[in-house]
């Protein structure tokens, strides 16, 4: 669920490109497909104890949907999607939608708005401390043999005689949920339901992302 009482959209990362301003400046943008967002359930304070909108995105074969989920979607009259997420909203926002209703991009976002984009970062596999934790290499010579890229000492003395939990070491890198905050919406293509967001967003091409109004939106430069 979102961290604020704001409706967001689910989408798929299409890729990156650049736009040019009237002054000729190049602006790198990520294209996010947010088409066919639809409401699967409207939760209310009376029935559920809180107010939210449950939204799905994409399409999925009927054979890949569990029976409980199929019944839930059939009740809403909605085609099965690839992902389902829930957004906490105000009662006023929830009152604008009913189960089965589409959520167009223009209802949620506007050009110039700050957004937070959440996705799954690209998996890098097993990585060393230099790549994983930005460690520096050891000396290339002067007596250093076969220890150029190792982390070095990881332990303590006889007391406590153990490696503390959380020690930065080698291990799996990437493939975790990441949120990039305060990105600008540069352009909205309402016909194709595309969001063009300034900068990079987490994940690989084709990965699912969740776009929300920024929780900690930064004030513009020059503001008091």
Swiss-Prot record:
<dbReference type="InterPro" id="IPR000597">
    <property type="entry name" value="Ribosomal_uL3"/>
</dbReference>
<dbReference type="GO" id="GO:0022625">
    <property type="term" value="C:cytosolic large ribosomal subunit"/>
</dbReference>
<comment type="subunit">
    <text>Part of the 50S ribosomal subunit. Forms a cluster with proteins L14 and L19.</text>
</comment>
<keyword id="KW-0694">RNA-binding</keyword>
<keyword id="KW-0699">rRNA-binding</keyword>
<dbReference type="InterPro" id="IPR009000">
    <property type="entry name" value="Transl_B-barrel_sf"/>
</dbReference>
<feature type="modified residue" description="N5-methylglutamine">
    <location>
        <position position="158"/>
    </location>
</feature>
<dbReference type="Pfam" id="PF00297">
    <property type="entry name" value="Ribosomal_L3"/>
</dbReference>
<dbReference type="GO" id="GO:0006412">
    <property type="term" value="P:translation"/>
</dbReference>
<comment type="function">
    <text>One of the primary rRNA binding proteins, it binds directly near the 3'-end of the 23S rRNA, where it nucleates assembly of the 50S subunit.</text>
</comment>
<dbReference type="InterPro" id="IPR019927">
    <property type="entry name" value="Ribosomal_uL3_bac/org-type"/>
</dbReference>
<dbReference type="GO" id="GO:0003735">
    <property type="term" value="F:structural constituent of ribosome"/>
</dbReference>
<dbReference type="InterPro" id="IPR019926">
    <property type="entry name" value="Ribosomal_uL3_CS"/>
</dbReference>
<comment type="similarity">
    <text>Belongs to the universal ribosomal protein uL3 family.</text>
</comment>
<dbReference type="GO" id="GO:0019843">
    <property type="term" value="F:rRNA binding"/>
</dbReference>
<protein>
    <recommendedName>
        <fullName>Large ribosomal subunit protein uL3</fullName>
    </recommendedName>
</protein>
<keyword id="KW-0689">Ribosomal protein</keyword>
<keyword id="KW-0687">Ribonucleoprotein</keyword>
<keyword id="KW-0488">Methylation</keyword>
